[in-house]
């Protein structure tokens, strides 16, 4: 059984945290984030740390309080360091380019795929085959990366497509004559 929820989240100097009912708010150098905690979980802010515990001793509440503690820790990391994902593009003629608040992707279709960059997310393209996605909200950074990857997921025969930089693509052998 995991005991992630028992550890308090220590709030460093330079970050302000507040708990009002079920809403946890954190402000830091990278912005402000909020998280609404489930009703089965109780959140307290005292002595410079946020503690999370279940209101009732049910299996559901015990499962949720570990998740809530991890979400609060992600808020803290987001407002201090931020989150970043790197995507690699592999394939002949596959490339990415930024055009203002839009990401243009040439992924082997008859047309270019244009992705509107949401607010709070920063995308940089240092090379035409690399995309860096950064922001202060872990969930939104991961969601944007997953949406871009879904336009052309890597295929197992040649490895062409958009993949996470740390992702391993299991390669298959083609059929033999």
From Swiss-Prot:
Superkingdom classification of source: Bacteria
Pfam families recorded: Ribosomal_L6
GO biological process entries: cytoplasmic translation
A GO cellular-component term linked to this record: cytosolic large ribosomal subunit
Gene Ontology molecular function, alphabetical: rRNA binding; structural constituent of ribosome
Biological role: This protein binds to the 23S rRNA, and is important in its secondary structure. It is located near the subunit interface in the base of the L7/L12 stalk, and near the tRNA binding site of the peptidyltransferase center.
Assembly with partners or alone: Part of the 50S ribosomal subunit.
PANTHER family: 60S/50S RIBOSOMAL PROTEIN L6/L9, LARGE RIBOSOMAL SUBUNIT PROTEIN UL6M
Protein name: Large ribosomal subunit protein uL6
Organism: Rhodopseudomonas palustris (strain BisB18)
Gene that this sequence comes from: rplF
